[in-house]
Amino acid sequence: MENRKTFSWLKEQMIRSISVSIMIYVITRTSISNAYPIFAQQGYENPREATGRIVCANCHLANKPVDIEVPQAVLPDTVFEAVLRIPYDMQLKQVLANGKKGGLNVGAVLILPEGFELAPPDRISPELKEKIGNLSFQSYRPNKKNILVIGPVPGKKYSEIVFPILSPDPATKKDVHFLKYPIYVGGNRGRGQIYPDGTKSNNTVYNATSTGIVKKILRKEKGGYEISIVDASDGRQVIDIIPPGPELLVSEGESIKLDQPLTSNPNVGGFGQGDAEIVLQDPLRVQGLLFFFASVILAQVFLVLKKKQFEKVQLYEMNF
């Protein structure tokens, strides 16, 4: 009887432990997914400022090119591709958060016209799914389905990102019209230089915060440096903290000036933005255009036939 009670108690404790583990996993997984993927989502209601500048440029300071390719025109309720290319030298290595070197990651934000959105999985063809790969897109905000974000993802595999887009149908969405619309895109390769709170990352250059002489350079156990700068005029001492990653450019006893670079700039990445235009085409206009072309061709055919008939009549009259 006592053994049975002990077994029952052990069974109950095991069930509780498993339940707690599952709850912790779910909570942790949810918090991670909510924080992923782009810092801009946390601090900006709209990723494109009134000036046209995409806010990712606030953290990624270097300017690099991107290329966006979309169809010239699409029909309503149609799935099409928006292809973003983020070119860079695949041999480059970036400074990671721990100071070590690693491959570059890429990320992007695609700002579509109102009404355009990510195509649902059941509307994406197998060929398009193969082009997309294992990428997972998400809306910038739940109420902004026309703004899509992706990343960070490995740059070597996804320097070309294919977005599956569904065009709107003005027949069901009265605020959408058959017009030419702009599309805006921003893409980065590599880590940023500034965090959203304004602090520097270890992927940027560090400058002296005071004029003076480098009295001491202390190499920290986990990487990085503490640089003691003494002002010769008043003896005031300032300590500049350098995180692991950037290479030191100064040495002890060296005289330096305010804002003089203490380290190299390890950044090899950068951010770029571009735009394109797309026409939401009315099917009736296309049909009308095809009818017009057919009419012109038929008119040309009848004109040729009439000319040949006239020539035959002239030849007959001359022979008569």
Curated annotation (Swiss-Prot):
Q: Which gene encodes it?
A: petA
Where heme binds, per the record, is at: Y36, C56, C59, H60
Listed HAMAP family? Cytb6_f_cytF (MF_00610)
Which family would the database say this protein is a member of?
Answer: Belongs to the cytochrome f family.
Report the protein's function: Component of the cytochrome b6-f complex, which mediates electron transfer between photosystem II (PSII) and photosystem I (PSI), cyclic electron flow around PSI, and state transitions.
Q: Where in the cell is it found?
A: Plastid, Chloroplast thylakoid membrane
Q: What is its main location?
A: plastid
Tell me the membrane topology, using the record's own terms: Single-pass membrane protein
Membrane-spanning parts: 286-306
Q: Which organism is the protein's source?
A: Saccharum officinarum
Pfam families in alphabetical order: Apocytochr_F_C (PF01333), Apocytochr_F_N (PF16639)
Q: State the Gene3D superfamilies in the record.
A: 2.40.50.100, Cytochrome f large domain (2.60.40.830), Single helix bin (1.20.5.700)
> What name does the UniProt record give this protein?
Cytochrome f
Q: Name one GO biological process term.
A: photosynthesis
How does the record describe its quaternary structure? Answer: The 4 large subunits of the cytochrome b6-f complex are cytochrome b6, subunit IV (17 kDa polypeptide, petD), cytochrome f and the Rieske protein, while the 4 small subunits are PetG, PetL, PetM and PetN. The complex functions as a dimer.
Q: Which residues form the signal peptide?
A: 1-35
Instruction: Name the domain of life this protein comes from.
Output: Eukaryota
- A Gene Ontology cellular-component term: chloroplast thylakoid membrane
The molecular function GO annotations come to: electron transfer activity; heme binding; iron ion binding
Q: Which cofactor does it need?
A: heme
Alphabetical list of PROSITE patterns matching this protein? CYTF
Q: Which UniProt keywords apply?
A: Chloroplast, Electron transport, Heme, Iron, Membrane, Metal-binding, Photosynthesis, Plastid, Signal, Thylakoid, Transmembrane, Transmembrane helix, Transport
Q: Does the keyword Membrane apply?
A: yes
The record's cofactor note says: Binds 1 heme group covalently.
